[in-house]
Amino acid sequence: MKNHHYLLLTPGPLTTTKTVKEVMLYDWCTWDTEYNELVQEIRKRLVSLATKEEEYYTTVFMQGSGTFSVESVIGSVIPQEGKLLVCTNGAYGKRIVQIATTLHINVVESYTNEWEPTNLAEVEEILQKDSEITHIAVVHCETTTGIINPIADVCRLGKQYGKVTIVDAMSSFGGVEMDVADLQIDFMISSANKCIQGVPGFGFVIAKRTELEQCKGRARSLSLDLYDQWETMELQNGKWRFTSPTHTVRAFYQALLELEEEGGVKARNTRYRNNQQVLVKRMREVGFEPLLDEAYQSPIITSFLYPGEGFTFQQLYEELKEHGFVIYPGKISKVDTFRIGNIGDVYESDIHQLVDCISEGVVIG
């Protein structure tokens, strides 16, 4: 493998700053007081990012990819007699269904086409008809396409019918403004290597304390027991139950500081949104149309339709990689697409350089 530095135009892992990388040059002990106090500081900062009503929420870390944290929530918060409604319009909603099925959790699905947002009328109809449902889950930014789902409306419906609300905000938290209390979210899940601009290694859950406190003994896994992980962090000053990804944690703290220096989530969202708008404008100029209606498009990642016969993604990928850019293949089943992300340490000038490569004939000639 060539030792090149590529600009990752992906939804995470993503391009990080030099300073985030540099803090990983030092080693940390998982039992060290200074390290555990750093964990506590990060937990506090995340709650502050998530809501103004900080006293009602807490943060739990979970080792592994973001999916580990999703599975931790699904497997730990739904009781044996519970039933989950999942709103799906992409691979990550489907993954929640798969997790629930694997864990033998009773699950029902509200399916929408991958290029359309959650169907609120159908969600309400299901909630009206099925009183056994106890929990409802939705993906905020479904990076299968880049679509933003109406989490405020989904959670409002959930609470209207007395359900516990779960939001997979893996690819939106830190890059899209939100307040979990205002949105009536009970459990929100995200990851270190997304909009906060850290590196892979752990995910985190912003949880409403009163809901999390009810989850003792519900977990269907030892290592993914969300309640036990939280209780240990609370009672032992930030200690993880099992070996934590120390370098990733330290890098994440640096990334949080840099988010603050940038001007917070609002400023980062402005940069991401500008990146995305410039990307679409420039790509249209060279013959590529976006998949989604602008009203549903996130500022995180954009799906583009294949321009015509003879186009192959692999050629696009390899030739862009030779010029220092890494993009994503498509992930939907019914339409040929590829995806370009614009989060991470990425700026408008990078977007122009990318599309300049395409317009100069590097990719499609």
Swiss-Prot record:
Enzyme class: transferase
Gene3D superfamilies: Aspartate Aminotransferase, domain 1, Type I PLP-dependent aspartate aminotransferase-like (Major domain)
Keywords: Aminotransferase, Pyridoxal phosphate, Pyruvate, Transferase
Modified residues annotated as N6-(pyridoxal phosphate)lysine in this record: 194
One biological process term in Gene Ontology: organic phosphonate catabolic process
Catalysed transformations (reactions): (2-aminoethyl)phosphonate + pyruvate = phosphonoacetaldehyde + L-alanine
Keyword Lipid metabolism: no
Family listed: Belongs to the class-V pyridoxal-phosphate-dependent aminotransferase family. PhnW subfamily.
Protein encoded by which gene: phnW
Name used for this protein in its record: 2-aminoethylphosphonate--pyruvate transaminase
Coiled coil: none
Named cofactor requirement(s): pyridoxal 5'-phosphate
Domain of life: Bacteria
Alphabetical list of InterPro entries matching this protein: Aminotrans_V_dom, NH2EtPonate_pyrv_transaminase, PyrdxlP-dep_Trfase, PyrdxlP-dep_Trfase_major, PyrdxlP-dep_Trfase_small, SP_NH2Trfase/AEP_transaminase
GO MF annotation: an example: 2-aminoethylphosphonate-pyruvate transaminase activity
Source organism of the structure: Bacillus cytotoxicus (strain DSM 22905 / CIP 110041 / 391-98 / NVH 391-98)
Function comment: Involved in phosphonate degradation.
